[in-house]
Amino acid sequence: MQRRLAATLASCLLLLFSLGVSPPAQAAMDVGKQVLIGADYSNKDLQGATFNLSNLREANLSGSDLRGASLYGAKLQDADLSGTDLREATLDSAVMTGTNLSDAVLEGAFAFNTRFTDVTITGADFTDVPMRGDQLKSLCAVADGINPVTGRSTRDSLGCA
């Protein structure tokens, strides 16, 4: 009886895999509402990861792939996000004070209520990133450089006059 059941199960699994049905993909990392001060997430594939309301002060996320990630309300004081891919990421209500965004690609990210204070944005690409006028004005005051990935000027990507 057990052999018959095992054989039937094996046959069903073989049939499913031959039809293109695969096991479920691993879920994206979720570290929301965590204290991650000084954490090292550099050069990692963090696509779709969730860092909502996490404290990432002094964290190193440089060179990481954060496409589609959610950093809603994250505290990113003095964090290193240089060279990160933040396309289509949610940054709304994040606090970026002293944050390094050099050469980051933020194209299509949502950052309307994000606070940018004393940030480094040399070479960052902000194409199609909605943000408040006061934040845009402060970023335009320090915008310079060309993004090495997209070839866009930081000033142009922000729409600075």
What are these model-derived regions, one by one?
Residues Q2-L9, L13-A161:
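Tandem repeat scaffolds
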